[in-house]
Amino acid sequence: MLKQSGHKHGKLLKILKHNKPKERKFGKGARRCERCGRYDGIIRRYGLYLCKDCFKEVAHELGFFKWGE
């Protein structure tokens, strides 16, 4: 991106301003995993906001356990 702006600070700011992602209010794009930043498989119950993989790693520390085992 610096090559495109020609190392000019004003041009770099303009490029960053017009290419930043839109802030989402609804849908999958509005929610991210708080640990890794993924958008897929978010567990929102109890206000966790963790993806399924991160939840599986920290579930026991949070007090969740599997009934069968």
Curated annotation (Swiss-Prot):
User: Would the keyword Zinc turn up in this protein's UniProt record?
Assistant: yes
Relay the cofactor remark from the entry: Binds 1 zinc ion per subunit.
Record-listed Zn(2+) binding positions = C33, C36, C51, C54
A GO term from the CC aspect:
cytosolic small ribosomal subunit
A GO molecular function held by the record:
rRNA binding
Q: Which BP terms does GO give this entry? A: cytoplasmic translation
Extract the InterPro entries matched here.
Ribosomal_uS14 (IPR001209), Ribosomal_uS14_arc (IPR023676), RIbosomal_uS14_euk_arc (IPR039744), Ribosomal_uS14_sf (IPR043140)
**UniProt key word Ribosomal protein:** yes
- Which keywords does this chain's UniProt record carry? Metal-binding, Ribonucleoprotein, Ribosomal protein, RNA-binding, rRNA-binding, Zinc
What's the cofactor?
Answer: Zn(2+)
Q: Which SUPFAM superfamilies match?
A: Glucocorticoid receptor-like (DNA-binding domain) (SSF57716)
State the function annotated in the UniProt record: Binds 16S rRNA, required for the assembly of 30S particles.
Quaternary context: Part of the 30S ribosomal subunit.
Q: Which NCBIfam families match?
A: PRK05766.1
What family classification does the UniProt entry report for this protein?
Belongs to the universal ribosomal protein uS14 family. Zinc-binding uS14 subfamily.
Protein name per UniProt: Small ribosomal subunit protein uS14
Name the gene. Answer: rps14
